[in-house]
């Protein structure tokens, strides 16, 4: 497929395919000043793979207190009412020469290298997670949605890769190459397998468009009565990178226990 030469066309694809998701949706970003900080606090530290949880907080109407309820005992309509926030999270990690990954901020242009970019489009809520005797708990981000993972190699310096549109523009300008992977999580519907790409997609105009279409599709499927929902732990917020693994472990332990 030929490369696009018009930013306006990317905007059109974005508006048509993903507008339904992002209307009223909060997007998590990182300030430029966080770039290069040894231990930044990012909007979210995602799990490598979203993890199915066993319990979710609900309100006991008899006692007017929050209790842990087994998600399998809840109807999908009840779960849907708990996942009240539509959000998109973007996190970027840089791969070093030894294969290790380091989190960086996502609102500034970056230099040559290989990067893993995680885009989470989710219906979600949060639950407090206590860990390591910390006075202020972390927040476990739980929900259902779509994860798009881009593995990108930048071919020049000063490339913006903190979003699907910037990635498409960078591809158009021959500044990046790479691939995209898709994972719908926390929802069961016969249409998922046929509408969400299973195979790795090349990072090109077609791949970017499929990403938008997949996000819009999942957003619609979440709202359908016939879709079964099972919330997953997506990641943790309110912690620094150095604390994140302890917080993630505590979240997995708490949310996988029987109520």
Where are these regions (language model features)?
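Bacterial N-terminal signal peptides
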Residues: 11-21
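Bacterial N-terminal signal peptides that target proteins for export
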Residues: 2-13
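Generic detector of short, well-ordered, non-transmembrane alpha-helical segments enriched
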Residues: 21, 104-106, 165
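Compositionally biased, intrinsically disordered low-complexity regions enriched in proline and serine
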Residues: 6-8, 22, 213, 233
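Short flexible linkers and secondary-structure junctions
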Residues: 97-109
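Membrane pore-forming effector domains from diverse proteins
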Residues: 28-93, 109-259
């Amino acid at each position: 497929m030929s490369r696009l030469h018009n930013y306006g066309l990317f905007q059109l694809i974005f508006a048509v395919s993903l507008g339904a998701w992002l209307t009223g949706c909060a997007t998590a970003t990182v300030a430029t000043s966080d770039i290069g900080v040894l231990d930044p606090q990012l909007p979210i530290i995602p799990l490598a793979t979203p993890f199915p949880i066993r319990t979710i907080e609900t309100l006991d109407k008899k006692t007017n207190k929050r209790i842990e309820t087994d998600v399998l005992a809840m109807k999908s309509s009840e779960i849907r009412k708990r996942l009240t926030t539509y959000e998109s999270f973007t996190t970027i990690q840089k791969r070093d020469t030894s294969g290790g990954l380091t989190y960086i901020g996502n609102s500034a242009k970056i230099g040559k290298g290989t990067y893993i970019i995680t885009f989470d489009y989710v219906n979600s809520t949060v639950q407090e997670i206590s860990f390591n005797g910390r006075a202020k708990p972390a927040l476990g981000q739980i929900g259902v949605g779509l994860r798009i993972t881009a593995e990108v190699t930048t071919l020049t310096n000063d490339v913006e890769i903190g979003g699907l549109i910037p990635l498409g523009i960078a591809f158009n300008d021959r500044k990046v190459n790479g691939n995209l992977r898709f994972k719908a999580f926390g929802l069961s519907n016969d249409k998922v397998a046929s509408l969400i790409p299973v195979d790795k997609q090349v990072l090109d105009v077609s791949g970017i468009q499929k990403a938008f279409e997949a996000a819009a599709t999942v957003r619609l499927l979440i709202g359908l009565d016939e879709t079964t929902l099972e919330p997953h732990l997506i990641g943790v917020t309110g912690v620094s990178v150095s604390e994140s693994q302890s917080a993630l472990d505590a979240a997995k332990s708490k949310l996988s226990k029987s109520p």
